[in-house]
Amino acid sequence: MNTDDGYITEDGRQIGGVVMEMKNITLRFGGVTAIEDITFDIREGEIRAIIGPNGAGKSSMLNVVSGFYVPQEGEVFFRGEKRPPLKPFEVARQGIARTFQNIALFEGMSVLDNVMTGRLTQMNSGFISQALWRGQAEREEIENREICEKVIDFLEIQSIRKTPVSRLPYGLKKRVELARALASEPELLLLDEPMAGMNVEEKEDMSRFILDVNDEFGTTIALIEHDMGVVMDLSDRVVVMDYGKKIGDGTPNEVRNNQAVIDAYLGCLLYTSPSPRDQRGSRMPSSA
C-alpha cells in the first residue's frame, strides 16, 4: 500500500515519505522536447529506477534533479519544499550526489585523492580560514580523510587506494566513481547507468554494493540502467519513459506486466514471469 507516509515493499521493507518530487516537468532544447509533463516522486529508503529506450529522456531527468538543467515548466520539490533553480554544487550541498554514464575521474590522481574530491562540497574551511585557523582546518581534513577511508573499505578498494586511476580496469573505475559520490554522505544518490560496459561478474559486484549502500547507509537511490535483469531485481519502484513521456510507473511486477511498457520497450516475449526474489539480502540479478 502506498501512502503519503510511505509504503511496504514487495519484500516487506518499510519505505518512508517523499524525498524528491518532480511535478509536471517539461524540458526543451530549442524545438526538441526532451521531457514532457512528467510527474513522479522518490521516497526515503527506496531504490527507484528510471528506464526507457535510448533517447527517452532518462539522463535529462537526472540532470534536472542534479541541477545541470533547469526545466522550462514544472516544479522540483525536495523534502517538501519547492526548490529554486540551483547550480549543481548547491544541489550537492543539499545532500544529492551523482555518478555519470561516462566515467569522469581524474586519471592522474590516486584512488584516495579522487574519493577525497567528493568531500569538497561538504568542506567549510576556505583558504582564508585555513590560514587563520589552521587547527580547525586540520581537524576537518582528518575528518574528511576518515570518511573517505571508510567508504574505500566499504567498497573493498583499499588495496588500490594509492594506485593512479589511469591504471585501473574499467569495472574498478566505476567503483571509484561510486566511492567519490558516497564520500559526500548523500541523502539521495543518483546513478546514471552504473553498470554500463561491465561484464557479468562486475555487474554482480556493483549490484551487491548498491544494495549494501541502500541497506547499511540508508541511502535513497535513483537508478538509470538498461539491464532489465538488474532493474527488476534491485528496484522497489520503476518509472518508464519513452520519447520524453512517462508511460509506466509502479513496482517491478506492475511495470513488467504493463502493456504500454511491453509494446514500447520490453518486448512481448520478455519478462513474462518474474525472476525469483528471496529476502532483501539476496536480491541479486541472475547471471544470465
PLM regions and their residue ranges:
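Glycine-rich phosphate-binding loops of nucleotide-dependent enzymes
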Residues: 4-270
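Conserved small/polar residues in nucleotide/adenosyl-binding loops
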Residues: 271-276
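Positively charged, low-complexity/disordered segments
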Residues: 277-278, 282-288
